[in-house]
Amino acid sequence: MYNLKNIYASITLYPHEINLVVSDNNNQFHVLYENSIANDELYTHAGITNKAKFKVVLNQLINNANDYLGFKLEKVIVVLAELVDDLEINRFKTDVFFTGYDFNHQDMLSSEKNRFLLKNRHINPNEVLDLVALNYRDLTTDKISKNFKYNCSYRANVIYYTTKNSLVKELKPFLKRNIIVKIDKIVTHHMVLAHSIKQINKNNLFVYLGEHTTDLMLFMDNALVDLVSEPFGRVNFLESDNDSENKALLEFLVDSTARIGDSGSIGMAYTDGSTYKEIRAVTIDDLIQSVNEKTKYLIDFINTNTEIFFQKYGFLPSTLLFYTKSKQLLNNFQLNQNLLSNHFKTVTIFKNEVQFVSRKYLLNCQTIALSWRQDQINVNPTSFALPFYSDKIEKQFKKSFLMLKVHTHINKLVQKLIK
């Protein structure tokens, strides 16, 4: 029997769509359910535009998951992706705490949040999105540690993430009153990307190329410690001096999963119902040159702010991670990575490491990984759903296990035939 354990659920709000992922993290990342729905004028970064419809859409998304899974979700984490452009990073040192037998890490952080707000009265409690303990100073040895031992005295270096974003202020009370599940927390894409599924406790610089903005983020000890944003995103790569038809062609090529460069030029014809019209041919070189120029602008932004980070902190991680949804822009960035600062010894294209899950669910999966790790630190096993058993999941697991056995048998048979 497949027992469900540590069930997590995350809803990611993008400017154009809403994604839901439910996972069982039973010592292995196991996606149970995924679904997506369009943002049909429900919200923008400035606020909720259609509250009645937004309520129906979110509850329908959750109910569909419940029906499919055979159990009831009780809470979710909400991620705001590319919707918050004023994220502030606030550093704070905790009071001394002793890690005795009755020590509770989560209670300590909650208490320190109240102390943080008392010392920063200009910050409204609703403006605090999340907090993370960056590291701990052992008061006996006066050394910094990434974790703590019991029966010792420490101070923690904590980071609080705050925003004055209008959507966040409106979203918190709206979700509390209108959604059929509890909201565990609301975070942004910047915060969850610090937690790669495979790279733990690793410092790096991360470039996130979104729809309208690019974020250069400095991560230390699995926490976002600095951030610079540029109003330059995927849409800027689609800007064209040519006619609108060629602009549409450029958009198709930027978003295509095929590699560019298989032909010298591209020409198309289309019909308006009565006559055929020809789209002026565009050479591949023209398209590549346009994308290259914009990629160089992006790299200049990275290099300039990398140097600012270096002057500010006195060091830089040797690894630069790059992520965008467009495969063509990923390819182009790799082709131009020699223009990057020599601070970086490694340039890595960041990928979703969860198998059989679409790239568009990356942030959902990262959010679940973040929650699972925080639960391990807090020694607080949790679940976002009850009960821990589902007939539907049991049947799916048995079916998957049977298919795995069939594939294994076929592979062994093929190997024997080859020999």
From Swiss-Prot:
Highest rank taxon of the organism: Bacteria
Protein name: Uncharacterized protein MG223 homolog
Organism: Mycoplasma pneumoniae (strain ATCC 29342 / M129 / Subtype 1)
Lineage: Bacteria, Bacillati, Mycoplasmatota, Mycoplasmoidales, Mycoplasmoidaceae
